[in-house]
Amino acid sequence: MNPVPPNPTTNAPAPGGATHPTPAGSGSPAAASPTFSPLYQQIKALITQSLQSGEWKPGELIPSEVELAGRFKVSQGTVRKAIDELAAENLVMRRQGKGTFVSTHHEARAHFRFLRLVPDEGVAHYPESKFIDVKRVRAPADVARLLDLKSGDAVIFIKRVQSFDAVPTIIEELWLPGLIFKGLTAERLVEYKGPMYGLFETEFGTRMIRASEQIRAVCADAGAAGLLGVAAGTPLLGAERVSFTYGDKPVELRRGLYLTAQHHYQNELN
């Protein structure tokens, strides 16, 4: 049994809502044969489209499995499998006895999903931020490439120092596409008390879905040493992260330097 919206002769919609029809008139057997995706993957793509379009806002309850099964004319088991995958990807959250909700960066557990630096002792908590610089600039070539922009396009540049218990620990430089984050100012960043990704989600309609990160050992130069209150040459952890929203669209480049004297980088792999 197929759901009504997808066309069975095309690929299922990608998470960003794109479809990829099989090219017509191709002479190769591979191109001439239609490509099918499992039914639950088609349903997953359709639900993701609704999330991306804002039909269900972050933090809102989505329709029940029974309601979604009726909407897409598929079995409840097919819907459940689709939602299981969405939950595994942190796009939705199941709450026992309450239903399934759209994930939000305002959830307490989401605060540490993208912050992997945790204390060697004690309970992990969110750092305090001091903004060093916030300005609108032209994207350098390397930044433009990583954000899928043109060199010279407008970006928002943010530099901040984050401290745990008044100890400077993280230096971050961020680049955000200027069109998406138009209106983001230093004043707004300072007055906003929640996680930065929560601000992006609420005021700019941009939710971080996943990130790709590169990590290497570096030494503090004079500038970093001064901001962190350590000697030049102190070992630091350097990380470059590109974060993506729906449709695998890059919307943030973040370069960080981490002092690990009292913290360590922790990740869970599954």
Can you name each region flagged by the protein language model?
Residues 1-74:
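Extreme N-terminal segment that seeds HTH/winged-HTH DNA-binding domains in transcriptional regulators
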Residues 2-25, 104-270:
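All-alpha effector-binding/dimerization core of bacterial HTH-type transcriptional repressors
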Residues 52, 75, 95-97, 203, ...:
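Short glycine/serine/threonine-biased micro-segments
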Residues 55-56, 89-97, 103-104:
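Beta-hairpin "wing" of winged helix-turn-helix
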Residues 78:
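Residues in the helix-turn-helix
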Residues 83:
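DNA major-groove recognition helix of helix-turn-helix
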